[in-house]
């Protein structure tokens, strides 16, 4: 056990985590050169296309160190994007150490900081590593100072390497063996194993990734899931070298996968503890805090026949992604669907894309909203995650919106642009610290403004150099109103949105104009209105198409023409009473893009 090392790799987006993992696997001979491909651990097609890591993956490698001993390295590659920080905290719960990878050209960024603090809070040994030293822009000395200054860990001795060219990879491995402590645990104690991740395999059922903290997990054991008390038989277990390799037992301190023929998706929740049935452990391992979704949106299948398939797909996906929340919802415009909770917009996009690809569904998404705390006139407090659930205005005493604390690292030359953006998003500055050329800014910005398009706008105003990390701070009273969109006098529930009163006329007008372009013309006028309660704040009309009924009248009497026009008018009137308007899919997506192009 003294030769086991469990560690994660944490870093900002694009600082080279996945490439470093590739090199470690290659150096330790986990895969032959023929099987090696770039980003070997990013197994989803989506991860490869976007070039980001979404799911944490684990690998077990054997490394023969310079002192002649062979060490077993279990490492977990983690995502860097702010929406997936829960994946990082799950991976860290299974480790004793973490490699903090920093790009020697870019330096420290917000995510580097956030993930590093998570690791330090969990009492892990953090080993700094400067990557990409082969770049002409690399300045390892400056970056090492930056790490000491901003993060506050000793980085003068940090290993300098280049994952792309393979320089310094041996030093990284030696550093892991020297600096990261061996796992603590008692092989003779009752079994305790932490479930780090689970996913659904069509042949094996539920596969769980576990870290054995105490005791030994053997094939054929009867095990018990501590939170549900259900017992299962261990059918197969083993490790990833990235390939799935079967073993007969997982020893204390090891990380591996387990299959116990669990058919039920909720059978082995992530963060739970496995123990043996005959000699159960007395206490549960401390898991990790459940993450609260920050953004809610309605997802509806385009054809209602897909509802069952959609429900199954969500179940399977939520097993693999513990932070996805969903509950059934009905909408008068869109039929049956689900209200889903996500960690951010990227998370929402990825879930939607995974549902469409992996499960072959066609979905409509409604506009994302955040959760509001609403105090009613009778003193009750309710939480509203969808505009259609907001009670009538005269029953509400106040609405409180969620405020996010945003930590940004910005180069000096873009400071002005970023501050302007934050003010426009109703932000309040709480702190500002200079670190050399970088400035650490702290703002409190309403969550509703952050989740919509703040990240994209921040990147574009700073040419991609500013970085962001945000977390929920508190609820704060604000003047929020619900804007309803009415088409021909009928409210379309899926298009409603909750906005700040000052922005309402402007958002309403923009949305109405956008809808006008998207709704196809009919034989009669279509009125599109935005309203707060009964007060109309914006209107626009999609003009009717009309046939020239006088074409056949060459000369003729004026009364004849009047008669024909009158007849047409009556027909249109009758049509307008009976006609209903089809709202195309693009119109629902229009809400997302309001305010983006106009600025």
Swiss-Prot record:
Reaction(s) the record says it catalyses: GTP + H2O = GDP + phosphate + H(+)
Entry keywords, A to Z: Cell inner membrane, Cell membrane, GTP-binding, Hydrolase, Membrane, Nucleotide-binding, Protein biosynthesis
Pfam family, one: GTP_EFTU
EC nos: 3.6.5.n1
UniProt GO cellular component terms: plasma membrane
A molecular function (GO) term: GTP binding
Signal peptide per UniProt: none
Sequence positions that bind GTP: 14-19, 131-134
Topological category with respect to the lipid bilayer: Peripheral membrane protein
InterPro entries named in the record: EF-4, EFG_III/V, EFG_V-like, EFTu-like_2, G_TR_CS, LepA_C_sf, LepA_CTD, LepA_IV
Domain tr-type G intervals: 2-184
Protein task: Required for accurate and efficient protein synthesis under certain stress conditions. May act as a fidelity factor of the translation reaction, by catalyzing a one-codon backward translocation of tRNAs on improperly translocated ribosomes. Back-translocation proceeds from a post-translocation (POST) complex to a pre-translocation (PRE) complex, thus giving elongation factor G a second chance to translocate the tRNAs correctly. Binds to ribosomes in a GTP-dependent manner.
Family: Belongs to the TRAFAC class translation factor GTPase superfamily. Classic translation factor GTPase family. LepA subfamily.
Protein name: Elongation factor 4
Organism: Mannheimia succiniciproducens (strain KCTC 0769BP / MBEL55E)
